[in-house]
Design a protein with these regions (language model features):
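Active-site rim/adjacent substrate-binding subdomains
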Residues: 1-104, 116, 120-126, 132-136
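Catalytic glutamate of the conserved HExxH
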Residues: 108, 112-116
Length: 138
């Protein structure tokens, strides 16, 4: 991270995401290392329209792919699933909440990975809370 008052860049967010990915227990998410992670500045208009969102600030991350619990035989062997993190909305949330940036990136990453595994919103919230509790103990 920059110590000179500059906002964290794409590479900074990517490094935080990679670190967070390697902190996630593999037993909880088998096959997690097969996901690719990308960091972009913000979602594009097409993405927002597909999701029914009007503002790019509403979307901090996106899972692109077919959740494991919805895959059929024809879906295997397709392009790897991807989690995209959006730097600018993440930074805005970071500023607004005062949360630690590594914790926020980890939360967004875990939320999107949980979509890959077909978790419900309730399961995702429980997982995020468990992860926050675990991070607080370290």
């Amino acid at each position: 991270m920059s110590d000179y008052g500059l906002p964290p860049g794409l590479n900074d967010i990517a490094a935080l995401a990679e670190r967070a990915l390697h902190e996630i227990p593999l037993g909880q998410f088998p096959g997690i290392r097969e996901l690719t992670i990308a960091v972009e500045d913000s979602p594009d208009d097409e993405m927002l329209a597909e999701l029914g969102l009007s503002s790019p600030w509403e979307l901090t991350g996106l899972y692109k792919g077919i959740p494991l619990d919805q895959r059929g035989i024809a879906d295997w062997g397709q392009e790897p699933d991807q989690v995209v993190l959006f730097r600018e909305p993440i930074l805005l949330e970071w500023i607004e909440t005062g949360d630690s940036l590594p914790d926020l990136v980890r939360t967004v990453l875990i939320h999107e990975i949980a979509h890959h595994f077909g978790f419900t919103d309730e399961q995702i919230e429980a997982l995020e809370q468990k992860t926050r509790d675990g991070a607080a103990r370290h």
